[in-house]
Amino acid sequence: MHVFWHQRDLRIPDNSGLAAATGEDTTLPVYIVDPELRERLGTRQWAFLLNGVRRLKERYRDRGSELLVREGDPADELGDLAAEYDADRVYYNRHYRPLGRKRQQRVDDTLSTEAVTDLVLVDPEALDPRYSSHSQFYTDWQAIEKSPPAAPSSDALTDVTDDTPVPEAEADIALPEAGYRAARARYDEFLESGIETYNDT
């Protein structure tokens, strides 16, 4: 069994790491509520993030699976879950910001992991860091093949039950609807009505 560790990627479709994990073995999806991240986010950001986790949990249940939600240090919590479910590897989508990289490094130092490129179309490490012009960067970027990940099969997701709730958080304003479906709807609306008037910068 594998564990897939959700972080910024609160979606099941179009998720390279999840597709890679489920393509190899039965996969247990997990989200860790990290107190260190909580300290760095504003109240509205935090509430919106947890709403997204809640929607993701619902989407997994729609597929007959479950998103396990735990709170604490990711390395500790993932280690406990890997031991409890006899998982041999933790998959995740690679981060590029300092806090995310630091958090992932702690997990790498503790567990057997597989980092997958997902948040960007091309992994920056695949490109020359010494470009003298944007046109050369663009040429190299275009030359790298990009294809959407396969959709994970519901049969590859673990059939477990877990009643641990997503923590509650209040915001002082009405927040937009969270989750993949709502985000996709906003994106489609922009393509239909907003892109023609969007300023080219």
Predicted regions mapped to residue ranges:
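Trp/Phe/Arg-rich N-terminal binding region typifying the photolyase-homology
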Residues: 1-148
